[in-house]
Amino acid sequence: MKNLANFKVAVKTREYLIQAIFQMLFSDQKASQIINQFKNEHKNKKLDFTLFTNSLNSIQNNRRRIESILISLNIKDSNIEIIDKSIMYFAINEMIRGDLDRPVVIDESLRLSKKFSSPESYKFINASLDKYLKTHK
């Protein structure tokens, strides 16, 4: 595994971002509510709240587009866990935004999957993102 020590704050921020996306999808809360909650609950932690806020707002704004991409990849709510869907939302949104190189997005998504999801989910995430890259260049 790559040394992520130099990117500790960004890595930790993305971990919290996955939790926030999960909350958004599970409870259908608005990004602003979740952002305020996370800022209050985690104000003493070393997190990049600008990255967190920009990403979560972008996901909310791109939600229909992300959903349509998931449908085009044959990913339906009935066959995906919410945590895996959260990771896919993160990855697709990052690729739409273009702030991170695509290989970095894929590596980070696989790392997040291994941390938060079932042991084999990273294979599903990897295959889905590979399919996305082949169809959405």
Question: Language model features by range: what are they?
Answer:
Residues 1-115, 119-122, 126-137:
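N-terminal interaction/assembly modules
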